[in-house]
Amino acid sequence: MVHLTPEEKSAVTALWGKVNVDEVGGEALGRLLVVYPWTQRFFESFGDLSTPDAVMGNPKVKAHGKKVLGAFSDGLAHLDNLKGTFATLSELHCDKLHVDPENFKLLGNVLVCVLAHHFGKEFTPPVQAAYQKVVAGVANALAHKYH
């Protein structure tokens, strides 16, 4: 559960309505793979990830980034039940993929950076603060099934 004030919830929802999920998703996942290259080990089947340009131009990275942000959108629609919303993904990432849950925090922070880049002055400090709460809540929900 994420505790947002009505103003924060409104700010998150208003900005998210303007997000191009295809573009932002691919950019966020691509940046994660470039900035934190050890995360690439989970995406070996994606082909060439040898350079920043290869990562950022990789169609599989873009497609998976879109999928990730689709799940994030679901979370925004269920802020009062993030653990329930992400239970299946938490299990998958824990039991099958063995993803270090710290990576969820990294991706959340990268997403905030990408949103700031895309929205500039519209991404005010209060909007950022609200998004930081949301990405922390999502990361916590995704880590819920870890033992």
UniProtKB/Swiss-Prot annotation:
Heterotetramer of two alpha chains and two beta chains. It comes from the Eukaryota. The modification Phosphoserine is found at S45. Belongs to the globin family. The modification S-nitrosocysteine is found at C94. Keywords: Acetylation, Heme, Iron, Metal-binding, Oxygen transport, Phosphoprotein, S-nitrosylation, Transport. Red blood cells. PROSITE patterns: GLOBIN (PS01033). This is Hemoglobin subunit beta. Involved in oxygen transport from the lung to the various peripheral tissues. One of its GO terms (biological process) is response to hydrogen peroxide. The keyword Metal-binding applies. Residues 3-147 form the Globin domain. Heme b binds at H64, H93. GO terms for cellular component: extracellular space; haptoglobin-hemoglobin complex; hemoglobin complex. Gene3D superfamilies: Globins. Pfam families: Globin. The modification Phosphothreonine is found at T13. GO terms for molecular function: haptoglobin binding; heme binding; hemoglobin alpha binding; metal ion binding; oxygen binding; oxygen carrier activity; peroxidase activity. It comes from Gorilla gorilla gorilla (Western lowland gorilla). The modification N-acetylvaline is found at V2. InterPro entries: Globin (IPR000971), Globin-like_sf (IPR009050), Globin/Proto (IPR012292), Hemoglobin_b (IPR002337), Hemoglobin_oxygen_transport (IPR050056). The modification N6-acetyllysine is found at K60, K83, K145.
